[in-house]
Amino acid sequence: MIQAMHAHLLPLVLLAGCAGAPMPADELARLDLDDLVAEACSPAAREPEYARHDASYRPAIIHELAQRLGWQPADVRRVTARQVWVGATREQVLAAWGRPWSTLRQVSRAGELQVWTYGRPVGPQSFVELLAERCISVTSYDR
């Protein structure tokens, strides 16, 4: 009887547990690098229309990444402005633009080339080429 009475609360509990709320700075500091980059790509950090978006969250993540990875002040400004440039690291591209729509991986004597596509096939698109986890090319165009 008790199970049946409270069964309607279960979806609410699960939703609250799954929702990506911004983490406090001390929790960000404890994340490993991959989890911190994933957090930079999260809706709470990237999407103003997200219910739990906090405008101060993305700068806190970028600050933590910059400290750990030794980013130059100019690079921090570019990532904060959502810019990607030739020479940017994989982490800087992800923190600036988030996860790509699709990826292509090619291995050759030169190393592993990755082409990250941002944007859907029917609208504006950008392509970021990474070699050895560094941006070597950024191409954008409208369709």
Language-model region placement:
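Residues within mature, well-folded domains
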Residues: A19-R143
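Sec-dependent signal peptide recognition
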Residues: Q3-L12
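C-terminal motif of bacterial Sec signal peptides marking the signal peptidase cleavage site
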Residues: L15-G17
